[in-house]
Amino acid sequence: MPRSLKKGPFVDEHLLKKVDVQNEKNTKQVIKTWSRRSTIIPDFIGHTFAVHDGRKHVPVFVTESMVGHKLGEFAPTRTFKGHIKDDRKSKRR
């Protein structure tokens, strides 16, 4: 069920403060965050966030089409190594 419109999007306060400070200074430094749950708002466009995926920080450059999504959607947490190809040597007996 989606979030109520009267509540507005959820953004961690510390993350919003960091973006506001960079917007005032007109700088575009990478913002390191563990807040995967924060919703991307229009103030974030053009900024790069280093979103934690559980072991490292993945750089995410925010574009206009990402508004409304969560930061965690763009930093996958699971690595898929692929299915194992059939080993002919072990099957032959």
From Swiss-Prot:
Alphabetized Pfam families for the sequence: Ribosomal_S19
InterPro entries reported for this sequence: Ribosomal_uS19, Ribosomal_uS19_bac-type, Ribosomal_uS19_CS, Ribosomal_uS19_SF
Swiss-Prot/TrEMBL GO biological process terms: ribosomal small subunit assembly; translation
Domain of life: Bacteria
Keyword Cell membrane: no
GO MF entries: rRNA binding; structural constituent of ribosome
Signal peptide: none
Gene Ontology cellular-component annotations: cytoplasm; plasma membrane; small ribosomal subunit
UniProt entry tagged with the keyword RNA-binding: yes
UniProtKB keywords: Ribonucleoprotein, Ribosomal protein, RNA-binding, rRNA-binding
Function: Protein S19 forms a complex with S13 that binds strongly to the 16S ribosomal RNA.
Annotated family: Belongs to the universal ribosomal protein uS19 family.
Record-given protein name: Small ribosomal subunit protein uS19
